[in-house]
Amino acid sequence: MNYHEHFDVIVIGGGHAGTEAAAAAARMGMNTLLLTHNIETLGQMSCNPAIGGIGKGHLVREIDALGGLMANAADKAGIQFRILNGSKGPAVRATRAQADRLLYKAAIREKLENQENLKIFQQEVEDLVVENDRVSGVVTKMGIKFSAKTVVLTVGTFLNGQIHVGLKNHSGGRAGDSASIGLAQRLRELPLRTGRLKTGTPARIDSRSIDFSALEVQHGDNPTPVFSFLGDRSEHPRQIPCYITHTNEKTHDIIRRNLDRSPMYSGVIEGVGPRYCPSIEDKVMRFADKNSHQIFVEPEGLTTNEIYPNGISTSLPFDVQIDFIRSMKGFENAFVTRPGYAIEYDYFDPRDLKSTLESKYIDGLFFAGQINGTTGYEEAAAQGLLAGMNAGLMVQDKEGWCPGRDQAYAGVLVDDLSTLGTKEPYRMFTSRAEYRLLLREDNADTRLTEKGRELGLVDDIRWKAFSMKQESVETEIQRLKNQWIHPKSENASQINALLKTPMQRESTLEGMIRRPEVNYQSLISIEGLGPVLENVQAAEQVEIIIKYQGYVDRQREEIEKLKRNEDTLLPIHLDYSDIKGLSNEVTAKLNDTKPENIGQASRISGITPAAISILLIYIKKNALRRKVL
């Protein structure tokens, strides 16, 4: 049957990509339909119960700056918050929240069910309607045909999903859910390159069977950070600790003895797994010199006894899982509530996508999330928001948009995928961004919220809060530039107590904050120098802007220089091993890819700004011109 209502945007899948895509399109005023196989699992955390981390926390803040859902849900569900790399520079500091699965899922669902212009329908999709290389709708398992101007595919690990525990396997999208077979077959009929990837999850353990007195306790930060720019600590539920244990030689021996029963090492699994989240089998074999690996013992929520042992993802047989788990300190009597497993699934080559995440070959069809070869909730959510937004822009006959590599980690993510593709599950790290000093967590709103407002993603409440914060930051920086302090002033002794060497001459407050040993809070708290900004995020941004302005300015100059040189052609026969100063990794990647110009070279993952500068000098010095074959 044909459904009576025509939609602007249809989103297939209700995971982290799908929920952000549907919400983004609806915020823009698009008549949006979210199709999911089960409304109860909207926003479900299928693997680890955590949001954020190095590189990932930056994505969460960017999603929030564009009006997305993830940061707000993490604030409402976070049962432990930590700032990672807190002792390092602001570019690599990252927020991470241990989350209550049920609270997170409930927060996402509440947002979706109260979002204007969004309808949710529970039904599995089996077919796409494609006419003259343009998508025009979808068909569900019941034969219901929904028509739409655009369709966003966010089907995660469900396409031809195959779950492995030991040498036994069965069809499934994740534990407890069936795989999407019909849609997978239909997509393989389209002119799209496809492949197989693999991911995995550890066994879950009943906390009542763990001896926590034998484990190292890990408390969260106090005061707790917040993820959302509109967030408040009062939204956080009760905070609880995590714990740490370790594998040992006995653990490793059990695993090594049973590798012939592993689907990964017996050749049953052909898909490539995530490099930066390896299974315990992989860790034992790849790092044979290590006799121990750290395992984080993470609660799954406030109302459950289940524990997520982060670091022992596995697809070994169930009996082997029990044996190696019980070999670890504190886990001698562990009761496993769910076995760990690996899952293989179809993904589609993201090089077949435009930077808007629309297919190059089928108009109006967008891809986001693990279907593009990524791994992680945050990577999926960022893609989902951009895909949903661009679907909305297409409906309005407006030009698509994707942030540049110098604007957002989301831009780095999409550029890496659409330019280079991936042969293994792609995870975001701060090291993937050339301009990470510009792409900090604290300034995600400064970078993106104004654009989000222009695109229709940002509502009045967020825009007002952002505008007030920006005004207070600018006003405070100007005040700090204009207010002078003198070596003989009344509060000089208090000021000198903050300094390594006493003041010798007068200085502005801005000049004092530039000193490495002085921070904004302690200086402005001195009588006569305040008041301190009440907005904690604004105060943090004031200090970072002042302390790092010189570095930021130099990086912006570097960006402008590189942009001017993007079209500089590179000789097709150039042997990059002849160029002194390039690392072996950079040389190998350039010789393998043979970029046509500096712009393409700069977008190869791992090619640093320093390497690009060396290339430019070499080209100029040798007056090289690209030879055409």
UniProtKB/Swiss-Prot annotation:
Record: residues binding NAD(+) = 273-287
This entry carries the following GO cellular component terms, namely: cytosol
The free-text function statement in the UniProt record for this protein reads:
NAD-binding protein involved in the addition of a carboxymethylaminomethyl (cmnm) group at the wobble position (U34) of certain tRNAs, forming tRNA-cmnm(5)s(2)U34.
Database matches in PROSITE patterns: GIDA_1, GIDA_2
Subunit composition and interactions: Homodimer. Heterotetramer of two MnmE and two MnmG subunits.
Family assignment from sequence similarity: Belongs to the MnmG family.
Q: Required cofactors, per record?
A: FAD
Origin species:
Psychromonas ingrahamii (strain DSM 17664 / CCUG 51855 / 37)
- Per its record, how is this protein called by name? tRNA uridine 5-carboxymethylaminomethyl modification enzyme MnmG
Tell me which InterPro entries the record gives.
FAD/NAD-bd_sf, GIDA_C_N, MnmG, MnmG-rel, MnmG-rel_CS, MnmG_C, MnmG_C_subdom, MnmG_C_subdom_sf
Q: Name one GO biological process term.
A: tRNA wobble uridine modification
